[in-house]
């Protein structure tokens, strides 16, 4: 019974002393119960959001980003860490293309036919492959890291159109910036585990056993194009392609640059700052 009911009773005919005593005894007993119940409800309502926030604390924030950088800038080091921290998919478009071809998907069959004829896979096919991965790959539910795409303004525009239509617009385009001279020193000493893509460096990040993968014990290889002359051509092509893309994302307001010449831990910290995490 509410206090308002008791107050309504109190306005009635005057009661005798024993009746009044019983009235007020019952009134205050019920009042204590009502107050206790209200306080308990308030405590529960205050604790519930806290408990929910604690339960959700292990769920990482979503990220949707493009990772830009020349060969040797450290994308292969940083992308797996981003994938693990934020529980997102890492879409290295070269790997994605090879996977679709190997699986003989409809898009993979189209791409293989074009490549077998010596042509370049169209922007439309590449964007549709990314769209397919975002839809079918459970790792992409919380976001994605795009690596190796886009490389041209039309690709960037088609990608943006598709992502906006999917309700998954890009949050950030992070560029790993580094001088070409340092890249030459890095890449000409690079060692790769072909099966996993793990990379090492003869000087900066040597394997525990020379020319041997730390995880599997398989032999490491040095890529045939990891030499100074081949690298210069790759860097020239990269700069010609990438500068317009960087300008495109600067204009959209989502670009952030990170100095990739720093130690990997510092680069990692700066990437998180660029993401606002």
Curated annotation (Swiss-Prot):
Q: What class of enzyme is it?
A: transferase
Its Gene Ontology cellular component terms are: cytoplasm; cytosol; mitochondrial intermembrane space; mitochondrion
Looking at the keywords, is Nucleotide-binding present? yes
Subcellular localization: Cytoplasm, Cytosol; Mitochondrion intermembrane space
Enumerate the UniProt keywords alphabetically.
Answer: ATP-binding, Cytoplasm, Kinase, Mitochondrion, Nucleotide-binding, Transferase
List positions binding ATP: 72-77, 190, 199-200, 262
* Any one Gene Ontology BP term: DNA replication initiation
The UniProt entry, under Pfam families, shows: ADK (PF00406), ADK_lid (PF05191)
**Which SUPFAM superfamilies does the record associate with it?**
Microbial and mitochondrial ADK, insert 'zinc finger' domain, P-loop containing nucleoside triphosphate hydrolases
- What are this entry's molecular-function GO terms? adenylate kinase activity; AMP binding; ATP binding; DNA replication origin binding
Domain comment from the record reads as follows: Consists of three domains, a large central CORE domain and two small peripheral domains, NMPbind and LID, which undergo movements during catalysis. The LID domain closes over the site of phosphoryl transfer upon ATP binding. Assembling and dissambling the active center during each catalytic cycle provides an effective means to prevent ATP hydrolysis.
Biological role: Catalyzes the reversible transfer of the terminal phosphate group between ATP and AMP. Plays an important role in cellular energy homeostasis and in adenine nucleotide metabolism. Adenylate kinase activity is critical for regulation of the phosphate utilization and the AMP de novo biosynthesis pathways.
Q: What HAMAP family does the database record attribute to this sequence? A: Adenylate_kinase_Adk, Adenylate_kinase_AK2
The family annotation for this protein states: Belongs to the adenylate kinase family. AK2 subfamily.
Q: What is this protein called?
A: Adenylate kinase
Please name the gene that encodes this protein: ADK1
């Amino acid at each position: 019974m509410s206090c308002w009911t008791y107050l309504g009773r109190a306005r009635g005919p005057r009661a005798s002393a024993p009746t009044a005593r019983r009235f007020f005894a019952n009134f205050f007993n019920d009042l204590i119960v009502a107050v206790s119940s209200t306080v308990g409800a308030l405590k529960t309502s205050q604790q519930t959001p806290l408990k929910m926030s604690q339960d959700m604390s292990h769920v990482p924030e979503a990220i949707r980003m493009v990772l830009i950088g020349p060969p040797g800038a450290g994308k292969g080091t940083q992308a797996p860490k981003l994938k693990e921290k934020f529980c997102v998919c890492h879409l290295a478009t070269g790997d994605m293309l090879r996977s679709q071809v190997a699986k003989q998907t409809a898009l993979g069959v189209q791409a293989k036919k074009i490549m077998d004829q010596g042509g370049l896979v169209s922007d439309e096919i590449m964007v549709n492959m990314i769209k397919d991965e975002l839809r079918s790959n459970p790792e992409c539910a919380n976001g994605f890291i795009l690596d190796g795409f886009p490389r041209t303004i039309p690709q960037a525009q088609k990608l943006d159109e598709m992502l906006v239509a999917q309700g998954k617009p890009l949050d950030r385009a992070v560029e790993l910036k580094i001088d070409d001279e340092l890249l030459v020193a890095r890449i000409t000493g690079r060692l790769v585990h072909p099966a996993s893509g793990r990379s090492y460096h003869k000087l900066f990040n040597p394997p525990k056993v020379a020319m041997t993968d730390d995880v599997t014990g398989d032999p490491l290889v040095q890529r045939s194009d990891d030499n100074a002359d081949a690298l210069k051509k790759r860097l020239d092509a990269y700069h010609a392609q990438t500068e317009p893309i960087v300008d495109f994302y600067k204009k959209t307001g989502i670009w952030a640059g990170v100095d990739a010449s720093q130690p990997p831990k510092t680069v990692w910290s700066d990437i998180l700052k660029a993401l606002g995490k």
